[in-house]
Amino acid sequence: MPRRLSWLVLSIAIAIPALAQTPMQVYGAWHCSTDYCTWAAVSSASTFDTDNHWMIDRHMNNTYQPSVNLVIFSFIQPVKLMNLTTDAGDTNGVPNAMNASAVSYFQSRGVRVMFSIGGQTYTSDWDTALATDPGTLGTNAANVAKQFNVGIEIDYENSSSPNLTGLEQFISSYRAVIPYDPTGNNPAARLTIDLGAGDQYLSSLAAYATTNWLTTSNPVLDYANAMVVRANTSVSSLESDWSQHIDGYPTLGVAPLAPAKLTGSFFLVNSKPIANCVGPFSSSQQSAAANFVETVAPDGAGTTAGMLGLMFWAAGCQGTHTACTFPPNTCQNGMGVAATTFNIPVPMPALRPQ
């Protein structure tokens, strides 16, 4: 290369600053247990370990380096929680298999646990509970969080007319029992919300949550998860969706969200496991998206680059037409390798505020 050209290339390289890179702090999976997200049936301790060992032991050799630092048990039915229902599948509003033993299985290895309230199937139940007694629902959710020492996730997927007044009452009642904790030391204080992959789905919820609950100056919720779309959605499409949250969507009234207040998400399985689960990691969506996740710059909210991390839908058996992440379809070669590659901290540290 001619000397003049080499100096030009060097000058350009120096003039273009490297993108700031922030390691992920959240790396987890929603969990649907053995019975398609009802958590009604309690497994024996040995079966539960066989099914989930990959999550707490990425090398599958009993060295117990977890593949995740967060697991979210999905789902609690909102009306049953409001009424503290006890029936064949629930005890005081909580599914039977979301018990102290299941929580301890993960927490004893440094993995944070949360319970998710709602999900798409229970959208109408969210509507009913928020119209009936959102304050009691929020208080009961906080008491469950304290009882099991877990966080709570809000998964309310009313895309047309969400009851934001009721949801505000739910959150206020929760926070009256358990205040926001920036240190993360109190697991029960962790309160998060699910939003659409981008701002074009659940737009009203995104607009209200971003302005009222997810600011860096006066946070009420810890962060938001951008939910999955379809298993075969391209990484570039998902990055475009996530950018809608970060950049804001003015025509829909959605303000910018700090990257530090957002996780992205991928599928683990479709009709069969995919590379995010079984590997090879180099062929996975999470590998392709890692640079964006760790370097995306704030655009109107927050001061640090990089999203908070990644979530995956879903461990366990999410439905009758999809694979489960139980043997032989366990995910240590996908998520486990990624946890090492991304240097995921276990236990999860205090989350960056900006």
Model-derived features: positions:
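Bacterial N-terminal signal peptides that target proteins for export
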Residues: M1-W7
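C-terminal cell-surface addressing/anchoring modules of secreted/extracellular proteins
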Residues: P353-Q354
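Chitinase-like catalytic core of GlcNAc-active glycosidases
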Residues: Q21-F292, T304-M307, W313-M348
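Bacterial N-terminal signal peptides
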Residues: W7-P17
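Conserved short secondary-structure transition element at the edge of the structured enzyme core
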Residues: V293-P298
